[in-house]
Every structure is written in structure tokens, then in C-alpha cells.
A protein has these predicted regions:
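Bacterial N-terminal signal peptides that target proteins for export
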Residues: 2-13
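Bacterial Sec-dependent signal peptides at the C-terminal "C-region" and cleavage site
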Residues: 19-29
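Short, charged low-complexity linear motifs
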Residues: 1-2, 133
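Aromatic (phenylalanine/tyrosine) cluster motif
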Residues: 11-14, 20-22
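Accessory carbohydrate-recognition regions in carbohydrate-active enzymes
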Residues: 28-306
Length: 306
């Protein structure tokens, strides 16, 4: 009798083992994993939310330059959004030798894309431009960022544009400014590619064409409200010499530290998604404008010490 009881207990324990095994494989989510940047991107009445990519309270932020979530056109790749609901200052249009409209100099061409090929996290953005066979990956820092562009076909090229401003190019470096609306405020750009272009043109739009055998172009840039030199310093301080994976890990850690200040208990995953997405939205404001101990004030158009 005792033997039968032992066998029965052993059998039941054997049946429970798979449950413990599967339970041990359950992924534990960090706070940033609950954030859904697409929540609210389609609005029935007011302006929708935008899937903003940035670090908490940072000066540099971007979101895809499209009409709405369902649009199939991008107004170039974004560089910096200068207001809560404004367009991006500057734009980057990657192209290859098969993109005829861009190749022939249409500076305002849209980029066709499919939102199913897009991935957005608070600290990361990627999109595959299937019509051009170009894969785009992006990660921001506080005042600078990195684009990794993989050209799977044709000769790689870039159009870098500024409306109401000017840009200059020296080998693999692009720098200049764009006026913000009708105000005296300027946003400055300093940009470097890790591949020296074969051919360049400058003006309101810079054209860069690269060797056909260089299929990956890493593009690092800094922005500033003070000067081009300060934009360069911001880039060198934050992203120079760092790759996409390193910056992605750093951004994820920063977001987890910020969102993790509030811990949520409960079994409702949807409620956690709503909470942490809402908390992520609050970090769009206020914005830290300090650049190496100084900041530009739009009230008097002067640079002040912190």
C-alpha cells in the first residue's frame, strides 16, 4: 500500500514538471517593454499622439515624418522635431541608383514605405524601405544620434535638406542651420558619415554619393541651438566611436531607470501597457536645453550660463 502511494506521488510530480519548466521560461518584462508608442496614433477628433523616439526630457527627439499612422509616404528621415506638433528641422533622404526621382534631383521627393516594415521603441527606430531595398536603423542620445543605413542594391546616396536655412559639405562632413518658422531661433546641425563620398553638391540640399561597394553607411550627427561648433561637441561627447548596439543598450537602460521609478503590481498586462505608455509621454516635457553648461534662450535670443 505504501509503495502504491509513493508511486502515485511520483507520477503526479512527474506530470507537474512540465508546468514548472514552462513557468520558468516566462519572459519578465521591464517597464520600457510595456510602452506602446503607437497608442493613440489614430485620432477621431483631435491631433493624434506621435510615436516619439527620444531619451527622457532630452533636447533631441524624432518621429516618422508622415501624415498619420496609415500613411505610406515619409517626408524624409527625421533629424530633430523642434516643437510638440511641428515638422522636423532638416531631413535625410537615402537613395540608390534605382531611385530615379531622387537621382534626377527632385529635392522634395517623398519616401514610399509600408508601416508594417517599421519598428519603434522609445529608444530605437527602424524601417525597411522595400521599394528601394534600404534598411534604416536609428538610435538617439540627448543631443545627438546615429543612423545606420544598409543599401542592399545600387550605389548608395544621401540627400540632406534644410528649408529656410543653409548647409555646407566638406568631404564626409555636413554642417549648417535651419531657421525655425518666423522666429530668430536657429537649430544647428553637424553631421559626419563614416564613408567618404565620391561626389557631393551643396546648397539648401546636400547631395552625397558613395562608392557602390560600401553598402553600409553610418551617419552620426549632433544638434544645437547655440552654434555648429557646439553641435559638433555634442556629437563627439555622446555618439562618436559608439555603435548602434551600444547606444541602443544605453538608451534602454536610461528609459528603464526613468520608468522604473514607479513599480506597478497586478496581473493585468493591458493596464501596465496603458500606465507605462502614459508615463513615457510625460517625459516629452520638460526639455533640458543645457549644452555643456550653457543654453540658448528664445526669449532674448542670447546664450546664457546655466
Amino acid at each position: 500500500m505504501k509503495r502504491k502511494i509513493q508511486d502515485c506521488l511520483a507520477y503526479r510530480l512527474f506530470l507537474l514538471l512540465p508546468l514548472f519548466s514552462f513557468g520558468g521560461c516566462v519572459e519578465i518584462k521591464a517597464p520600457v517593454d510595456y510602452v506602446n508608442p503607437y497608442m493613440g496614433n489614430i485620432s477621431h477628433l483631435l491631433v493624434p499622439t506621435y510615436p516619439t523616439v527620444h531619451l527622457p526630457n532630452s533636447m533631441l527627439r524624432i518621429y516618422p515624418q508622415r501624415e498619420d499612422y496609415t500613411s505610406n509616404k515619409l517626408k524624409g528621415l527625421p533629424v530633430i522635431v523642434t516643437s510638440h506638433r511641428g515638422n522636423s528641422a532638416f531631413s535625410i533622404n537615402p537613395f540608390n541608383s534605382f531611385c530615379d526621382s531622387l537621382e534626377k534631383g527632385s529635392r522634395s521627393s517623398f519616401i514610399l514605405y509600408n508601416y508594417d516594415n517599421e519598428k519603434i521603441k522609445p529608444y530605437y527606430y527602424s524601417v525597411f524601405l522595400s521599394d528601394y531595398d534600404i534598411e534604416v536603423k536609428y538610435v538617439p542620445s540627448h543631443q545627438s544620434a546615429l543612423y545606420q543605413l544598409d543599401f542592399r542594391a545600387g550605389q548608395p546616396g544621401l540627400l540632406i535638406g534644410a528649408t529656410n536655412g543653409e548647409l555646407h559639405v566638406e568631404k564626409n562632413k555636413v554642417f549648417g542651420y535651419q531657421q525655425i518658422g518666423s522666429y530668430e531661433t536657429r537649430v544647428y546641425l553637424y553631421l559626419e558619415t563614416d564613408v567618404v563620398p565620391l561626389q557631393t553638391e551643396e546648397g539648401n540640399t546636400v547631395v552625397m554619393k558613395f562608392p557602390e561597394n560600401d553598402k553600409r553607411i553610418n551617419l552620426r550627427y549632433g544638434i544645437s541651438f547655440i552654434s555648429v561648433d557646439q553641435a559638433k561637441k555634442n556629437m563627439e561627447r555622446e555618439v562618436a566611436g559608439k555603435d548602434l548596439e551600444t547606444l541602443t543598450r544605453t538608451g534602454r537602460t536610461i528609459w528603464n531607470d526613468a520608468l522604473g521609478k514607479i513599480q506597478v503590481k497586478g496581473n493585468c498586462e493591458d493596464s501596465k501597457t496603458i500606465f507605462y505608455t502614459s508615463l513615457y509621454r510625460t517625459y516629452e516635457r520638460m526639455v533640458c536645453l543645457s549644452e555643456d553648461g550653457q543654453y540658448y534662450s528664445a526669449f532674448d535670443n542670447q546664450v546664457h550660463q546655466d
